[in-house]
């Protein structure tokens, strides 16, 4: 979590948009359920949205367009879910996608390795051509 926290804090300091999809074990998560309150979403920054592609059924795309955002940074768990789902969804909608591999996790190392390979090389060209794999300490705002 230190890598995600560092990237989160840098985004906040730069005035970048931060958006959360909260699910939780029961599908009814709220900002009070965030494991580390240092990551607590502010009003208007979150939705309760399940599924791997966080664009579906959410206000994410409207918020990105409203701010003229062209590049998204995807963090979270599970890498093979949100990383591939939202990362691919972003690329297919024309966004450049930054994948800091040290800010996504999965249930095991195989799922993490598969997701990284899929997003960087193994997925469809429309996705892989829009993805940059990196580490969180290389992301600048």
Describe each region flagged by the PLM.
Residues 1-5:
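Short catalytic helix/loop segments, enriched in acidic residues and glycine
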Residues 8-26:
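Von Willebrand factor
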Residues 13, 26-141:
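Active-site-adjacent betaalpha module
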């Amino acid at each position: 979590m230190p890598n995600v926290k560092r990237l989160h804090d840098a985004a906040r300091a730069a005035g970048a948009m931060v958006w959360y999809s909260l699910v939780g074990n029961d599908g009814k998560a709220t900002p009070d359920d965030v494991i580390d309150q240092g990551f607590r979403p502010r009003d208007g920054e979150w939705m309760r949205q399940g599924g791997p592609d966080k664009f579906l059924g959410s206000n994410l795309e409207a918020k990105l367009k409203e701010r003229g955002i062209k590049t998204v940074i995807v963090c979270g768990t599970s890498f093979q879910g949100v990383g591939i789902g939202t990362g691919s969804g972003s690329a297919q909608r024309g966004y450049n996608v930054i994948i800091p591999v040290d800010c996504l996790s999965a249930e095991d190392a195989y799922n993490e390795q598969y997701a990284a390979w899929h997003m960087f090389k193994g997925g469809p060209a429309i996705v892989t051509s829009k993805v940059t794999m990196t580490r969180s300490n290389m992301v600048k705002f």
